[in-house]
Structures are given as C-alpha cells and as structure tokens.
Amino acid sequence: MWYTTVRNPSIALIKQGYHILAEYNLVKEELKNIYAIPSYACGLHWFGVIFVHSGIYAGSVFRFSILLPDNFPVDISLPTVVFSTAVLHPHICPQNKTLDLAHFLNEWRKDEHHIWHPYCAERHLKFMDQLKSPCWKEATSMDCSQPSQYLGHIDSSRQLDEEEANQVVKLHCGRVPEPQREAAEVSL
C-alpha cells in the first residue's frame, strides 16, 4: 500500500524530521565558527552561536535562533533568524533583532538551499562595505567616516553580551548546591 503525505500527516512529519536531521548533518560539515543545533522540543527551531574572528566585529560572540516555516522544506518562505541581543548592523532590525535574509536569498528552494545558507549570510555580516547599502536607518544613521564611533557602538553591544553571559552564570551558580559550586570554582 502506498502512503501519500496528503492523506497521512504523520508520514509528512516523519519525512520532515528526516530532512531536518540531514540538514543538521550538513550544518556540522559546512560551517566554521558557527555552531547550531535543532531544539529538542521542535526541529523547526534551531539555536546557534557565531564566533567572529575578523573584521569590525572581531572578538564578538552572537547567539541566535533560526525559526523554520511549518511546511519546511516545501514552503518557499525564508527562515527567520533572530539574534538574542541587539546587533548594530544595517541588515538586522533593531526592534525585533531579525536578520533581513531577503538581501541574500529571494525565496527558499528546497532543491537548492540548505539550512546552512542563512548561517553563511550571518558570517558575511562582518564586512564594513555593507554599510554603503543600508537596510536599517539606525545602524547607518551614524557617520561611517568616523569608524571609531561605529566601533564604539559595537563594543558597547559586545559588553551587553558579556553582561548577559555573566547574569546566566550567576543564575546557574544560584541553582548549584554550595559544595558543588566550590568544587566547580576550584576546577577553574
């Protein structure tokens, strides 16, 4: 007996799960300095972190989430990339912290695109020449002839990331029993 995904949504869900697993294996092979993994609760929600080693964002670490459409990979709508902290960049909306992927991809084509394509777009955010073709007014309202001022804003957002990381460590230490906390501090 032949099952179609139209009549059997559970088969469609299983196929989607296998497709996401295959995409995860590709992500592990294709990317450097970007680490991503699908959520345990939902394969359509991925968590990631990017380590920037060059360019004006050198030394920065940015956490982000990727939300895939419900009908992934069949849907032509693009995934949504959301950064966990505000990033000053012309292709990242300062209000909702989303990356404008339309600059890199017009529509999702399941035979051509993979989940690592948005990650590659993120990797290319570090270049200063993109400031000449702005998408967001706040990031480009600054005078780019004064790179030190722009870099100062980048440094301040990097400090916000460090402060957030310190708060997470404090929260985690608050949950760890005292003897285990002391043992962890000694091992550092």
Swiss-Prot record:
Domain UBC core positions: 15-174
Kindly give the SUPFAM superfamilies that the UniProt entry links to this protein.
UBC-like
CDD domains referenced in this protein's UniProt entry, alphabetically: UEV_AKTIP
Could you name the domain of life of the organism this protein comes from?
Eukaryota
User: One short Pfam family name for this protein?
Assistant: UQ_con
UniProt cross-references to Gene3D superfamilies, sorted A to Z? Ubiquitin Conjugating Enzyme
InterPro entries named in the record: UBQ-conjugat_E2_core, UBQ-conjugating_enzyme/RWD
Family membership, please give it.
Belongs to the ubiquitin-conjugating enzyme family. FTS subfamily.
Q: What is this protein's name?
A: Protein crossbronx-like
Q: Which organism is it from?
A: Drosophila simulans (Fruit fly)
- Which taxonomic lineage is given here? Eukaryota, Metazoa, Ecdysozoa, Arthropoda, Hexapoda
